[in-house]
Amino acid sequence: GIRTIGELAVMDLELLKRHLKKQGEFIWNYANGRDVSPFLRELPRNKGYGNSMTTPFDVTDRETAWQVILSLTETVCARLRADGMEAACVGISITDREFRHGSVQTTLISATDTTLEIYEAARSLFDRLWNHSPIRQMGVHTSKVSPKGHYQYQLFDRGLHDKYSRLDAAVDEIRKRYGEDCVQRAVFVENRIPHMSGGIDKVKRTGVTKAV
C-alpha cells in the first residue's frame, strides 16, 4: 500500500528487506535521502589529456598553425606533468571555416610528458592532415596515459629526452612560484596567440594563478 516516497521513508526497514531483499534497503535509503555509495578517497585518473582552441581568426598558413599546436601542447603537457603522468598516444583535430572536422592520432615509441616531444608528434600529424582550408578550431589530445616510468630511449636520441625533461621541470618550477606567464617561448612574445591556451582555466591546468 505504499504510494509516495514519504510513505516509503517511514516504512519498517526489516519488513522491506524481507519482501524486496537488498533492493528494499536501497530504495528505503534513497527515500530517506541517504547515499550509501562507496566513498572514493581519490578521483579516478584521467584516461587522456587534451585541449582545444577556437581561434579568433582564420589560420591559413602552416607556421601559425604550428604556433597554435605548440600553445595547446604547452597546456596539455603541463597538466600531464602536474599529475605525474605521461602519454603514449598523441592526436590532433582540426575544424575548418566550413565546420568540416578531421582528426588523426599516432602511437609514440615511448610514453612521454615532455612538451617538445609531444609537440613534434602533433606537428607531424597536422602536416599529414591539413588540406589547406582555413582553420577555426584546433585541438591536441593525448591518450594511453600511465604513471611516469622509465623512458624507452631511441637509437639516435642523443640525450634529447633528458634535456627536454630537465627544461620542462625547470620551467614548471618557475611557473609554479611566479605564475605561468613569467616564462614563455620567444615565438609568443607580442603574438596574438597566447603561449598556453585551451578550454581549461589556469588553476586546473597548473595549480597556479599568479605570483604572490
Model region roles, listed by residue range:
Residues 110-212:
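Acidic, metal-coordinating catalytic segment for phosphate/diphosphate chemistry
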Residues 2-135:
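DNA-contacting surface of Y-family translesion DNA polymerases
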